[in-house]
Regions:
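Acidic, low-complexity cytosolic segments
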Residues: 1-30, 39-145
Length: 145
């Protein structure tokens, strides 16, 4: 389970992890699932994904999402709904999943990409309230006194 500093940490992260595990179990080609903030912090992960790997996947997914958003802005193509990266042995899907959050899935290369995209959209709709990630606020220096 990935920890989140909010007061709802245990409940929220536990619910997210359960929903991500459900996705991995139902769609057999999905290897791993992670929920991340737009700045690349993992806030939930499927079972079987080590914390270090969840954090790495979240950072990579955040980078791809950021690049896609930049391309959309630069070329007047609008917002990004989903980013997909095809590798020799896997696909990486990244989709917006609520205010300030993304859902990332790593799948086998044999995955039905249409089915994966459909299931991602269902998951995002089903758990939108769990996927809200408030923007981080910079720490203020202590008051002089």
């Amino acid at each position: 389970m990935i920890q989140d500093p909010s007061p709802r940490t245990d409940r929220r992260s536990g619910e997210l992890d359960w929903l991500l595990d459900d996705m991995v179990l139902r769609v057999t080609e999905v290897r791993h699932a992670v929920v991340l903030s737009n700045d690349g912090l993992a806030v939930g992960a499927s079972t079987g994904l080590k914390r270090e790997d969840a954090e790495h996947l979240a950072a990579v997914a955040s980078g791809f999402n950021s690049l896609a958003k930049g391309a959309g802005r630069h070329f007047g193509a609008g917002g990004v709904r989903q980013t997909m990266v095809e590798m020799d042995d896997a696909f990486l899907f990244v989709a917006a999943a609520g205010d300030g959050s993304c859902l990332a899935l790593l799948t086998d290369v044999t995955a039905d990409i249409g089915l994966v995209a459909y299931e991602m959209a269902r998951l995002v709709k089903r758990v939108g309230e769990h996927l809200y990630t408030a923007p981080r606020v910079a720490a203020r220096p202590p008051a002089a006194g």
